[in-house]
Regions:
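Conserved catalytic/switch belt of AAA+ P-loop NTPases
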Residues: 1-34, 38-43
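C-terminal alpha-helical "lid" subdomain
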Residues: 48, 52-157
């Protein structure tokens, strides 16, 4: 199939301008890329840009799902767990699925689900969370353990 596409591109009329877009640029065959006169990378987001975009996406989804609570500070701490924050499309899907599959009777369950998705840690250790700079209240949200119990666990040495 690739060779047929390459042959077709080689035989295009010179009067035709072909423009293509993809978010899978790294997966393309180099021979295919050589057929284009220019390749432009639009992924020039800074980490701060991605945080801003994520907050906008979060706000939009929280407005649609009335059972959710807002904790943008914790949301941003969770985003900081990423070495590389995903680009907007993937970020939107991650946020949407965390909210959509959250427990309706737990207003911050989406944050726990988001943390699990980002860190691949379904049951985070309270001491590790504290070492990462999470507050007792944030640890309560992420671990599901009451604040008083979290405090006792953190006081144990």
């Amino acid at each position: 199939a690739t060779s047929a596409v390459l042959k077709g591109m080689d035989n295009l009329n010179d009067q035709i301008v072909m423009i293509a877009t993809t978010n899978l640029f790294d997966s393309f065959d180099k021979a295919l890329l050589r057929r284009f006169d220019a390749c432009i990378d639009f992924n020039r987001y800074s980490r701060e840009d991605l945080h801003d975009i994520a907050e906008i996406v979060l706000r939009d989804f929280l407005n649609k799902f009335k059972h959710t609570g807002r904790n943008v500070r914790l949301f941003n701490k969770i985003l900081d767990e990423f070495n590389n924050i995903p680009y907007p499309g993937e970020l939107k899907n991650l946020i949407k699925s965390s909210i959509a599959f959250s427990k309706p009777d737990d207003e911050f369950d989406y944050l726990k689900r988001l943390y699990t998705a980002v860190t691949n840690t379904p049951n985070p250790d309270v001491k590790e969370l504290q070492a990462k700079g999470y507050t007792v209240r944030e640890i309560e949200i992420l671990s599901g353990i009451s604040k008083s119990h979290v405090s006792r666990l953190l006081q144990e040495v």
